Amino acid sequence: MAFQGPGRSLPGQLCAGVFGGLIQPPLGQKFYCPNGGSGGGGVPAVPSPLPQALSAPQCNGDGRGEPEPDRPIGYGAFGVVWSVTDPRDGKRVALKKMPNVFQNLVSCKRVFRELKMLCFFKHDNVLSALDILQPPQIDCFEEIYVITELMQTDLHKVIVSPQPLSSDHIKVFLYQILRGLKYLHSAGILHRDIKPGNLLVNSNCVLKICDFGLARVEELDESQHMTQEVVTQYYRAPEILMGSRHYRSAIDIWSVGCIFAELLGRRILFQAQSPIQQLDLITDLLGTPPLTAMRSACEGARAHILRGPHKPPSLSVLYMLSGEATHEAVHLLCRMLLFDPLKRISAKDALAHPYLEEGRLRYHTCMCHCCYSVSSGRVYTADFEPTATNRFDDSYEKSLTSVWQVKELVHRFITDQQQGKRPPLCINPHSAAFKTFIRSTAWHSSKVSKKEER
């Protein structure tokens, strides 16, 4: 159940009225909500903006008419996301509710990792935490609420919509995906669930990678086994399908390759009913892999490949995805969809491919925050695709041995994050949406593995 304000206040003190938004400042904190404005003119966004019909309703920023109600906008295995109003400035934001965090040690560690990552990220194409709601006293601490930027839609909804996608759209989307992925990989982080639904998009075509529930730091020791319960099947790399106990950042690149093909063809590239069928579809396209490409595969998967008929590659069919599947596009796509992960292109090298030159130019001409315009022209940043300033540190996880220990650390972490920042917020139990909010939950927690994650 959602906590009813900070543990240092009584629930009845939280709200002067019966209604109000789902989040609010604690007792005694008042904020002025500006009327806002539509913003000044500027360079039109290119490529052409996506239609509002694909997007979440926009906040009424001019102060007129009925305010937009707080409402759920997304559900996942590890949380629920609501669209709410930040009472400190009147802006619409996304509120992620992480329920039942402290059920077991694996769940605790996973949520703590995701929380630390969201606070670590500093990149325009990676979703990060804007704020964390004030926790109650530790005895009542069961749920975590994270505020992030509110995006209008996701790439899956764009792909399945009737919205035409030009070459400009595809290039600027792919550029941003790889730009964000280069940053994550430079921090030593594997996303492990790159798919269109985890790529948030605004109508101006700005894109952010989200959902780090399965993300973890790359394991450099190849003797350490890693979980195979990662990546949605359609976007799962062949080394995972073949039972590899160790993998690296190349698994994310494979997923991006599948998404690239999906943007070109407007359909899922490898859509199978089972992991074995998924592997068969991959070899239908790429051909039978050499033994060296199956070095990390389990014996059963290797035997399945070898006892089947030898398949020649049929990569020429990629040109039939659409009229946008040019030679440069297919060349880059083939570098991403290599069976051997050691030969698969990296995010850094993919960004240097000629196919993405136009995407880079369009993004930095009118979409990014790292470049700016002056009267004499455009001032460009010295580094178009920045890396993380340091690697994400997960060494603390080795010392986590109990649920209560993690609970104390998470509580302290959230409290420390709020020091010196904006006035804190908490859940408003008197809001019209509160009853619906406390009933909204993630997918059934029993479906989430309790095995130790690696």
From Swiss-Prot:
Which key words tag this protein in UniProt?
ATP-binding, Cytoplasm, Developmental protein, Kinase, Magnesium, Metal-binding, Nucleotide-binding, Nucleus, Phosphoprotein, Serine/threonine-protein kinase, Transcription, Transcription regulation, Transferase, Ubl conjugation pathway, Wnt signaling pathway
Which CDD domains would you find in this protein's record? STKc_NLK (cd07853)
* Residues reported in the UniProt entry to bind ATP: 73-81, 96
Enzyme nomenclature, EC number:
2.7.11.24
Q: Where in the cell is it found?
A: Nucleus; Cytoplasm
Question: Does the keyword Transcription feature in the UniProt annotation?
Answer: yes
* Protein kinase domain sequence ranges: 67-356
Regulation of activity is described as:
Activated by tyrosine and threonine phosphorylation.
GO terms under cellular component: cytoplasm; nucleus
Instruction: Extract the InterPro entries matched here.
Output: Kinase-like_dom_sf (IPR011009), MAP_kinase (IPR050117), MAP_kinase_CS (IPR003527), Prot_kinase_dom (IPR000719), Protein_kinase_ATP_BS (IPR017441), Ser/Thr_kinase_AS (IPR008271)
Which EC class, in a word? Answer: transferase
**What cofactor(s) does the depicted protein rely on?**
Mg(2+)
Q: Which reaction does it catalyse?
A: L-seryl-[protein] + ATP = O-phospho-L-seryl-[protein] + ADP + H(+); L-threonyl-[protein] + ATP = O-phospho-L-threonyl-[protein] + ADP + H(+)
Stated role = Negatively regulates Wnt/beta-catenin-signaling during development. Plays a role together with sox11 in neural induction during early embryogenesis. Involved in TGFbeta-mediated mesoderm induction in early embryos, acting downstream of map3k7/tak1 to phosphorylate stat3. Augments the rnf138/narf-directed ubiquitination and degradation of tcf/lef by enhancing the association of rnf138/narf and tcf/lef. Phosphorylates mef2a to play a role in anterior neural development, including eye formation.
Quaternary structure annotation from Swiss-Prot or TrEMBL: Interacts with sox11, hmgxb4/hmg2l1, rnf138/narf, stat3.1 and mef2a.
For this entry, the protein name equals: Serine/threonine-protein kinase NLK2
> What is the species of this protein?
Xenopus tropicalis
Record lineage: Eukaryota, Metazoa, Chordata, Craniata, Vertebrata
